Amino acid sequence: GFTLCKNPDNSEYSLIYYDVEKEELIVDQTHSSLRAHIPLKLRKDWYRLDTTKPVEIRLFIDGSVVEGFINDEDAFTTRIFPLKENSTLLELFSDGNTTEVAAEVWRLKDARVKMNF
């Protein structure tokens, strides 16, 4: 699984992970923000993942938007609103068997968009 937008004192973070036994994809936002009036939810849904094959999960975090793509077949989107500027850490975790991970990280440049409204 992934811990996203975590700060060093662990007061803000979001989790995205797969429960193999229950066949559930889980997005845990119960600690995603210290801001007032932000819904802190635990979302989960049935999802069958063939764990006998390599799994590719791509996550794109752009501001408050998190987009996930699983094996180029399925996608999900959520939003998170961390308050602290140092809520930028990313961690990977696994329970159970040994997991092999390959990761690439890209830093996106700010878009220079003109809004003519």
Tell where the protein language model's regions lie, with residue ranges.
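Beta-rich accessory regions
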Residues: 1-117
